[in-house]
């Protein structure tokens, strides 16, 4: 029998070498899980298959792990390392013989109990052939090639058709000491071990492939049979005086417009195309904090990805990154503007479902869409949508649109069993493809519709776009959020009717803000946005190379030692390496003279660079405010710095979606300034190091906030110098003054006089009770007056004089 087994293993290994290409996750399992190849090692898998064993053996050899085909010495015993929970069924019949897994588990546990040895590694390994979720009603191809437990004959077809898409995921070794320490019947422990493994593999399969897919016809029929849509069809027939059949047909048309038509084959094709595209466009894609998603899937959570929206490239980048992490691509809420030929069909088969900008006046559409979204959650599909609603044209986060999040919570009120978690995602680029279009739109040009010609133009202009960045933020469990903030939320659960309790709106708005905060917590610094921070505050947007490198080193050390959040990622390269990389992107001019090199932003890029600076300006808000104060005062105290930050931080927090202020943050910033020899700290007293280099560094850092503080001064100035001003007048006059100030002082940043930004700031002042409604209009509080005096001390005299002259002239 041993000879037969040996021959079969050799044969399967040969076939594996010819036909199988395995993708392994994590990429370095030995480092990720601190695996020790010298420790006793076992691999527990779902299926006892020779092809699975052969594929695993090749991967283990590549990563320096013990061979799963060999036996492991454990005490006086020799045990098979490969533990398969289930045997494949025979060629004829459905009942498979039981495996030796239970006996193997018992032998391992008996050894642990008798010897006390704690270094035994039992590693769960998920092995999948292809990532197709399967059909609820299998077709011929499914019967031949796809089965969780195929016979050896069907397994040949599986390897033949899906061998190039073999997927192997190692998981954290099972903590057997916890299992052994439990006060349970010793005889039950092996069964519990296998039960834990089965649950794990079921969740891993669901995370990698998603639930089984119904046919489009099945999906539509189930949706049309729901009580909610039935009632909406009846209402449609009455309202439009048409027959039930016509109203039903209208609902079918809407479903065809909305519903995704997910195809794993399309995903595979797209994955290969996107791999080629990224290599053409980018020098690499940096992806961070993926382990959080795997923790959620291991716990059986449904996931909602909520990224910021910089570019149409986001759709591709995030889906690609998720797929490469061994997770099923989410169903993506895409604007109806993207449903054009042929892109619409490609997006739809890649998991996109389409949403109109407004549901207003169309009750049938609203009912159909909400029911479709509810079914996605009920069936267990992951979903992705952009909480900003559209792409940011300025580089800063847009105020969240809460419609999709509200519908998500309403779906939860249908009584979904599984927990649902939101994963905020920060996306950043060193070059945004649409940046020139954004600038034109901010200048007042009409937004152009999407078309296939735009895509061809983008592809034609393929060039070096630097690096892309994708950071997964801290997850938010919606269930836990509601438990904490709305403890009685389960009282409103109804299995069929769409619920809209009074608490829904406020809780959705608050949750949306938390998502935005966590997106900004996970921001990514890169060469372009850091250089934008430095060069945009300098005359002519240029700086000598030595000073530029010194300032870049200052910022890198500041962000590494006194980071706003532990999720912020900073480049690991040296300033010199970052500058060399940035110069290859054709965004900078290098001017040489007898004194050395000067680095300047290319003329055509100067206004565009405000976009990249806005991506990370929030990370420098507090350091910049402190630096500006230090530069102006030269001598101050820690207490005054804390008071200044306390005055402005609520305004910053609303504008940039910042988390609650951590007092330790100010301490860490000042400590970093001390370490970089910018200040001297003597108890509460701070003295600036009075050297030219020190002054220049603090001046450049402080200037990063200039435009923001000038906007504040414009709005607050009108309020403080009037006896009351109407909101509409305040908005209008503030925009006019901002435009005038821009002309006087050469400010070309589009959002400086963007009405939306000014209106948002005024709304924030009201929300924080810094302004209130009086008989004559808006009036300021005492606290606002104090903020106004702080602004007067911080802003340059010539700028303050320009603001003061115009404000006082207008308010006479």
UniProtKB/Swiss-Prot annotation:
Task: Name its pathway.
Answer: Phospholipid metabolism; CDP-diacylglycerol biosynthesis; CDP-diacylglycerol from sn-glycerol 3-phosphate: step 1/3
GO BP annotations listed: CDP-diacylglycerol biosynthetic process; fatty acid metabolic process
User: Which GO terms of the molecular function aspect are on file?
Assistant: glycerol-3-phosphate O-acyltransferase activity
Q: Family, per the entry?
A: Belongs to the GPAT/DAPAT family.
Q: Does the keyword Transferase apply?
A: yes
UniProt comment concerning the protein's domains: The HXXXXD motif is essential for acyltransferase activity and may constitute the binding site for the phosphate moiety of the glycerol-3-phosphate.
Its placement in the membrane is given as: Peripheral membrane protein
The source's superkingdom equals: Bacteria
HAMAP family xrefs: Glyc3P_acyltrans
- Tell me the lineage of the source organism: Bacteria, Pseudomonadati, Pseudomonadota, Gammaproteobacteria, Alteromonadales
Query: Which GO terms of the cellular component aspect does the record hold?
Result: plasma membrane
Q: Where is this motif: HXXXXD motif?
A: 308-313
EC numbers for this chain: 2.3.1.15
Q: Which gene encodes it?
A: plsB
Annotated localization:
Cell inner membrane
Q: Per the record, what are the reactions this protein catalyses?
A: sn-glycerol 3-phosphate + an acyl-CoA = a 1-acyl-sn-glycero-3-phosphate + CoA
- Name of protein: Glycerol-3-phosphate acyltransferase
Q: Name one Pfam family in it.
A: Acyltransferase
């Amino acid at each position: 029998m041993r000879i037969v087994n040996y021959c079969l293993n050799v044969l399967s290994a040969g076939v594996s070498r010819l036909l199988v290409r395995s993708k392994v996750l994590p990429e370095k399992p030995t480092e990720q899980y601190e695996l020790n190849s010298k420790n006793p090692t076992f691999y527990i898998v779902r299926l006892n298959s020779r092809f699975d064993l052969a594929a695993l053996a090749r991967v283990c050899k590549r990563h320096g792990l013990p061979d799963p085909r060999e036996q492991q010495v454990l005490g006086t015993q020799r045990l098979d390392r490969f533990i398969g929970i289930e045997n494949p069924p025979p060629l004829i019949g459905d009942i498979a013989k039981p495996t030796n897994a239970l006996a193997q588990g018992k032998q391992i546990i008996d050894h642990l109990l008798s010897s006390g040895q704690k270094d035994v590694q039992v590693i769960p390994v998920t092995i999948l052939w292809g990532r197709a979720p399967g059909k609820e009603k299998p077709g011929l191809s499914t019967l031949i090639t796809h089965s969780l437990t195929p016979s050896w004959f069907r397994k040949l077809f599986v390897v033949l058709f899906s061998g190039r898409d073999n997927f192997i995921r190692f998981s954290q070794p099972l903590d057997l000491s916890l299992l052994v320490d439990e006060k349970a019947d010793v005889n039950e422990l092996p069964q519990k071990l296998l039960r834990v493994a089965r649950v794990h593999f079921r969740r891993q399969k669901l995370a990698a492939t998603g639930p089984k897919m119904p046919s489009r016809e099945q999906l539509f029929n189930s949706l049309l049979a729901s009580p909610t849509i039935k009632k909406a069809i009846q209402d449609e027939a009455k309202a439009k005086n048409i027959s039930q059949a016509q109203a039903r047909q209208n609902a079918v048309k809407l479903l065809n417009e909305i519903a995704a038509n997910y195809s794993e084959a399309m995903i595979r094709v797209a994955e290969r195309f996107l791999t080629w595209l990224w290599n053409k466009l980018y020098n690499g894609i940096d992806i961070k904090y993926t382990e959080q998603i795997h923790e959620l899937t291991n716990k059986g959570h449904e996931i909602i990805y909520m990224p910021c929206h910089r570019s149409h490239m986001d759709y591709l980048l995030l889906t690609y990154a998720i797929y490469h992490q061994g997770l099923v691509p989410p169903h993506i809420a895409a604007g109806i503007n993207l449903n054009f030929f042929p892109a619409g069909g490609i997006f739809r088969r890649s998991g996109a479902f389409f949403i109109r900008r407004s549901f207003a006046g169309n009750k049938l559409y609203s009912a159909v869409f909400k029911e479709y979204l509810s079914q996605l959650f009920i069936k267990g599909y992951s979903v992705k949508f952009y909480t900003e609603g559209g792409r940011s044209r300025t580089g800063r986060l847009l105020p969240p649109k809460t419609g999709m999040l509200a519908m998500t919570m309403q779906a939860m009120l249908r009584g979904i069993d599984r927990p649902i978690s939101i994963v905020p995602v920060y996306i950043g680029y060193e070059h945004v493809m649409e940046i020139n279009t954004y600038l034109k739109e901010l200048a007042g040009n009409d937004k152009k519709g999407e078309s296939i010609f735009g895509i061809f133009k983008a592809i034609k202009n393929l060039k070096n776009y630097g690096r892309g960045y994708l950071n997964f933020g801290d997850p938010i469990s919606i269930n836990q959020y509601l438990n904490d903030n709305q403890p009685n939320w389960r009282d409103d659960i109804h299995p069929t009717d769409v619920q809209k309790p009074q608490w829904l709106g406020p809780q959705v708005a608050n949750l949306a803000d938390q998502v935005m905060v966590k997106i900004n917590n996970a921001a990514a610094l890169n060469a372009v946005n850091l250089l934008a921070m430095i060069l945009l505050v300098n005359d002519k947007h240029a700086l000598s190379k030595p000073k530029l490198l010194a300032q870049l080193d200052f910022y890198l050390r500041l962000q590494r030692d006194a980071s706003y959040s532990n999720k912020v990622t900073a480049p690991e390269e040296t300033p010199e390496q970052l500058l060399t990389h940035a110069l290859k992107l054709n965004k900078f001019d290098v001017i040489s003279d007898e004194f050395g090199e000067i680095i300047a932003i290319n003329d055509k890029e100067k206004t565009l660079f405000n976009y990249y600076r806005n991506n990370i300006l929030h990370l420098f808000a507090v350091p910049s405010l402190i630096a500006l104060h230090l530069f102006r005062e030269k001598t101050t105290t820690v207490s005054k710095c804390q008071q200044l930050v306390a005055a402005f931080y609520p305004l910053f927090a609303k504008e940039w979606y910042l988390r609650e202020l951590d007092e330790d943050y100010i301490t860490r910033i000042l400590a970093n300034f001390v370490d970089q020899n910018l200040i001297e700290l003597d108890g509460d007293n701070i003295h600036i190091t009075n050297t030219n280099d020190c002054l220049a560094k603090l001046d450049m850092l402080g200037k990063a906030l200039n435009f923001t503080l000038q906007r504040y001064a414009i709005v607050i100035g009108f309020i403080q110098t009037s006896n009351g001003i109407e909101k509409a007048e305040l908005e209008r006059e503030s925009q006019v003054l901002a435009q005038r100030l821009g002309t006087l002082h050469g400010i070309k940043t589009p959002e400086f006089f963007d009405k939306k930004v000014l209106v948002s700031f005024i709304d924030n002042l009201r929300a924080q009770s810094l302004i209130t409604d009086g008989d004559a209009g808006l009036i300021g509080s005492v606290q606002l007056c104090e903020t106004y005096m702080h602004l007067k001390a911080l802003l340059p005299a010539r700028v303050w004089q320009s603001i003061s002259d115009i404000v006082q002239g207008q308010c006479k």
